[in-house]
Amino acid sequence: MRQIEIGLYVNNIVWVDDNILNANWENKGLMEMAYNKNRALKIIPKITTNTAMAFLKSFKTFIKGGTIKYKIISDMTRNNEYPADNAGARLVKYLQNNGFGDIEIMIFTSSKEKALRELKKLNVVMNGRIKVTTFTSDAINFLVSN
């Protein structure tokens, strides 16, 4: 059976993390807290940069038209990609290079310094729509704010 996702809610969060489908995923509680604070959230899990981008491309018309709001939250490291240690930075760079530079993005990571270094290496333009944090409270605020 194949799953078809419809990202046509008003507040969509594309959450990119290679462990997001694991039952003991470390951020499961964070996701639940955000949803409990804002039941209008539609969290769309993606386990790779490529699957996230394919999903976003399929809704580009809606995103660009402002009909539907998307935010992206990502970890920095994904062991199912190569190179693994800068997957979040590569996602941000890909978004900027493919017409998604106006989407709000958060890198939620264990090392803000490393994330900023990787973003700089890839010449990511650090506009006000890109946030990097290690704090759960920042992630919750990002997820639930409109």
What function would you assign to each model-found segment?
Residues 22-28, 56, 82-86, 116-120:
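A short acidic (Asp/Glu
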Residues 16-17, 46-49, 72:
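Conserved sequence signature across two-component system core domains
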Residues 52-99:
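Conserved phosphotransfer microenvironments
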Residues 16-20, 76-77, 110:
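Structural motif
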Residues 1-42, 125-146:
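Non-catalytic signal-transmission and effector/linker regions of two-component phosphorelay proteins
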Residues 8-10, 40, 66-69, 102-103:
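A general structural motif
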Residues 45-53, 136:
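Conserved Asp/Asn-Gly motif in the active-site loop of CheY-like receiver
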